[in-house]
């Protein structure tokens, strides 16, 4: 469902007000006082987060973000705070960032925190958005959409609940029995809750869901509030790993991404690769594309590529802000239609999804020609916040960001076996190189060389790109896609491609594949190849690990290759401590960073950065539940 932003309005006394719901965003006696008295003190904070590794707060309505800012500020002020703070919140009508800035200016004491939040504020697209703040110590996970859907899709273990939103009379859906039972599903064993509402139906609904509630003195002109705790068994937080060490096999975008994400959480990572350095396989191309693939029904591919693109660019911006020499530019991506029928479908997709125009809009042939700097016969999609990334520089930046948390082993062609409670990586002579309780297979097509990965239907797809001489500033000035893609000039070269041949193991550059790439380029930009001064003599061949459904494989590796009887995905036996990060196909840049964040969150017992149905769609064991589909030899 498209996201409709909140409109900025104020009540007569100046309190932020929603015309859609006819209610104020916080108490007219003061939003900050309400946040401290009702939501923080009502949940026993800051005392309850002291001494913990992490503390997870789940909120039903983000609104202005005032409860989040108050929680973040209180956490920063407390010298005995938890190591990490997770704040998870739903919002059906999020504010535009410029409106948030105006609202946050009312609380100058939060100015530095508010500025950081605003600088990281995500695109107003439906789904989950994860923001890393305060040097990664504070994690804000936002679900833009209906809270009934969001709470059902979230995977988290909440220590405290903030029940905030417009009044039950104005917004009954947010105070329904379904909401309360969804909160109970997320509750940790010692979870507490607090809310300003003492309505009878709220008290009774919470009791029926398993919460014990009591009235307490309210804030300002409101005489009473509610606080409570969960009486059910709840979900015990995943215990911290006794030894936070992992083996990561493979140092392409997948392996370096998970290594960086684990190192950011304090893990020690042993990174092993058969090559002499990072990005020597499919991740070694001169330039690749980071952009989504929308669909009319907003299917899983569409949602995952959107989430991966948005999170991927936020990750790139964090690395660049840290001063790392990562080569990437969100110059925009044009995806042109093949024919008039597809052009009409692309227009319909844009109209149906109604995403922010800065993220996706339809452009005519005339506008596409102007944007790209070359005349084209048809229009298509314009992704204004997407662009190109140089994969080797991303891999290098990930390793630099991981610092001493990552120890690399090059020229390490290894075998993997479990010994007692650890996975051991040994070289060809049997010498032990590294061992850890957790092992992650991120070796691209090399994953097929590990017998334990036999349940994973990874196939190799050969891809050849062509490198064309390109003066700086020459057309096209943005990334352009149709049946293939072409990048703008990057260090004097333009990357065009790519072929996609399943089961082809020829590692040599082929003239016929250069011709195929040029044919795709000519079909996209009529007359362009005739203007080339020279035909491509340079290029690169890579072998991409692809899956039958074109979605990556992220999670625990199944311990069997077939099922004797039907069962649920969660019931499939897994190898203890063995995980896969593979099947990225031609979209390694799109998948890698978000997939790594998802797996790292699973390993650390944190709230997940994706909806549950999307996490299941990535589970490596999913292929045991259905017949494998044939992977077509096209991209």
UniProtKB/Swiss-Prot annotation:
Signal peptide per UniProt: none
Annotated spans, tRNA (mnm(5)s(2)U34)-methyltransferase: 1-231
EC number: 2.1.1.61, 1.5.-.-
GO biological process, alphabetically ordered: methylation; tRNA wobble uridine modification
Catalyzed reactions: 5-aminomethyl-2-thiouridine(34) in tRNA + S-adenosyl-L-methionine = 5-methylaminomethyl-2-thiouridine(34) in tRNA + S-adenosyl-L-homocysteine + H(+)
Region (FAD-dependent cmnm(5)s(2)U34 oxidoreductase): 249-635
Entry superkingdom: Bacteria
Main location as per UniProt: cytoplasm
GO cellular component: cytoplasm
Cofactor: FAD
UniProt keyword terms in alphabetical order: Cytoplasm, FAD, Flavoprotein, Methyltransferase, Multifunctional enzyme, Oxidoreductase, S-adenosyl-L-methionine, Transferase, tRNA processing
GO molecular function, one term: flavin adenine dinucleotide binding
Function: Catalyzes the last two steps in the biosynthesis of 5-methylaminomethyl-2-thiouridine (mnm(5)s(2)U) at the wobble position (U34) in tRNA. Catalyzes the FAD-dependent demodification of cmnm(5)s(2)U34 to nm(5)s(2)U34, followed by the transfer of a methyl group from S-adenosyl-L-methionine to nm(5)s(2)U34, to form mnm(5)s(2)U34.
Family, similarity comment: In the N-terminal section; belongs to the methyltransferase superfamily. tRNA (mnm(5)s(2)U34)-methyltransferase family. In the C-terminal section; belongs to the DAO family.
UniProt xrefs under PANTHER family: SARCOSINE DEHYDROGENASE-RELATED, TRNA 5-METHYLAMINOMETHYL-2-THIOURIDINE BIOSYNTHESIS BIFUNCTIONAL PROTEIN MNMC
Name the UniProt record assigns to this protein: tRNA 5-methylaminomethyl-2-thiouridine biosynthesis bifunctional protein MnmC
Organism listed in the record: Azoarcus sp. (strain BH72)
Organism lineage string: Bacteria, Pseudomonadati, Pseudomonadota, Betaproteobacteria, Rhodocyclales
């Amino acid at each position: 469902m498209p996201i409709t932003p909140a409109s900025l309005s104020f009540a007569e006394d100046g309190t932020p007000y929603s015309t859609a719901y006819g209610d104020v965003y916080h108490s007219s006696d003061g939003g900050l006082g309400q946040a401290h008295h009702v939501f923080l003190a009502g949940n026993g904070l800051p005392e309850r987060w002291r001494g913990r590794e992490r503390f997870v707060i789940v909120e039903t309505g983000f609104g202005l973000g005032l409860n989040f800012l108050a929680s973040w500020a209180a956490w920063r002020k407390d010298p005995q705070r938890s190591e990490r703070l997770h704040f998870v919140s739903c919002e059906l009508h999020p504010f535009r960032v410029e409106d948030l800035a105006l609202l946050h200016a009312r609380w100058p004491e939060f100015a530095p925190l508010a500025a950081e939040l605003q600088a990281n504020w995500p695109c107003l697209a439906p789904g989950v958005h994860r923001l890393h703040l305060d040097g990664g110590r504070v994690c804000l996970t936002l679900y833009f959409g209906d809270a009934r859907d969001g709470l059902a899709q979230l995977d988290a273990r909440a220590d405290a609940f903030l029940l905030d939103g417009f009044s039950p009379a104005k917004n009954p859906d947010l105070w329904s029995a379904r909401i309360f039972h969804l909160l109970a599903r997320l509750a940790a064993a010692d979870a507490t809750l607090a809310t300003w509402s003492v309505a009878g139906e709220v008290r009774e609904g919470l009791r029926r869901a398993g919460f014990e509630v009591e009235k307490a003195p309210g804030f300002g002109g409101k005489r009473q509030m509610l606080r409570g705790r969960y009486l059910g068994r709840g979900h015990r937080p995943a215990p911290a790993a006794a030894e936070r060490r992992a083996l990561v096999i493979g140092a392409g975008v997948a392996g370096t991404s998970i290594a960086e994400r684990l190192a950011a959480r304090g893990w020690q990572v042993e990174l092993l690769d058969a090559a002499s350095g990072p990005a020597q396989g499919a991740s070694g191309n001169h330039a690749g594309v980071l952009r989504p693939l929308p669909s009319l029904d907003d299917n899983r591919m569409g949602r995952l590529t959107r989430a991966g693109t948005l999170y991927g660019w936020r990750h790139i911006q964090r690395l660049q802000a840290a001063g790392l020499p990562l080569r990437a530019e969100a110059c925009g991506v044009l995806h042109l239609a093949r024919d008039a029928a597809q052009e009409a479908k692309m227009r319909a997709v844009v109209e149906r999804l109604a995403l922010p125009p800065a993220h996706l809009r339809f452009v005519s042939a005339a506008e596409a020609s102007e944007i790209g700097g070359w005349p084209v016969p048809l229009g298509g999609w314009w992704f204004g916040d997407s662009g190109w990334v140089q994969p080797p520089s991303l891999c290098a930046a990930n390793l630099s960001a991981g610092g001493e948390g990552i120890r690399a082993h090059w020229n390490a062609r290894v075998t993997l076996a479990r010994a007692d409670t650890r996975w051991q990586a040994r070289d060809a002579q049997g010498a032990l190189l590294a061992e850890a309780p957790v092992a992650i297979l991120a070796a691209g097509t090399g994953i097929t060389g590990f017998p334990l990965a036999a349940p994973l239907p990874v196939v190799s797809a050969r891809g050849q790109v062509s490198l064309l001489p390109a003066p700086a500033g020459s057309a096209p000035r943005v990334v352009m896609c149709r049946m293939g893609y072409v990048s703008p000039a990057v260090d004097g070269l333009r990357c065009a491609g790519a072929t996609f041949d399943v089961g082809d193991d020829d590692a040599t550059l082929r003239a016929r594949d250069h011709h195929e790439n040029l044919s795709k380029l000519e079909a996209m930009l009529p007359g362009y190849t005739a203007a080339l001064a020279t035909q491509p003599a340079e290029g690169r061949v890579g072998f991409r690990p692809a899956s039958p459904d074109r979605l990556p494989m992220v999670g625990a590796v199944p311990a069997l290759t077939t099922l004797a009887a039907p069962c649920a995905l969660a019931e499939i036996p897994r190898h203890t401590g063995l995980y896969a990060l593979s099947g990225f196909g031609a979209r390694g840049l799109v998948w890698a960073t978000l997939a790594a964040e998802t797996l790292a969150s699973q390993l650390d017992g944190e709230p997940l950065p994706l909806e549950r149905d999307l996490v299941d769609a990535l589970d490596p064991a999913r292929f045991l539940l259905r017949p494998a589909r044939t992977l077509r030899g096209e991209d």
